[in-house]
Amino acid sequence: MERIASFSVDHLLLEPGVYVSRIDRDPATGAVVTTFDLRLTTPNKEPVMNTAECHTIEHLGATFLRNHAEWSSRIVYFGPMGCRTGFYLVVFGEVTSEEILPLVRELFEFVADFEGDVPGAAPEECGNYLDQNLPMANWLARRYLDRDLADIDENHLHYQQA
């Protein structure tokens, strides 16, 4: 089998940022989707996110994105990476990291400032509704904004090659 694109990124060089992971086209319709790698922690160097805060960011992020005035109709998916170092954001259209950056900043401001009941955190709405950690989700979002997104540069918007 061929190695998939995400495994060809050198995770020893990868740092937190906003990267285009892949751009896919439906061969039948020509529809395009862009997958973004929203990397919150440095792989294999910083601790990964625990499932509870990851789950909370997923609930808040999906709710925010699917209700966004400009982007809601273009959102395909938002959810955690299996390695728990970040999230995937999938949108309709061919979109660059620079173009998605304002939305990513808005999204993580929403998560960082969120107070109250986490949307979808009820037994009839979620299969693991008790696995939530809002204070840690707030903290991770604020750190991503302040440390990684505030003065983001080219090296953190495009994958670097060895």
What are these regions (language model features)?
Residues 78-150:
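Active-site-adjacent, His/Asp/Glu-enriched structural segments that form or flank metal-binding
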Residues 3, 22-25, 39, 66, ...:
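Arginine residue identity/basic-tract feature
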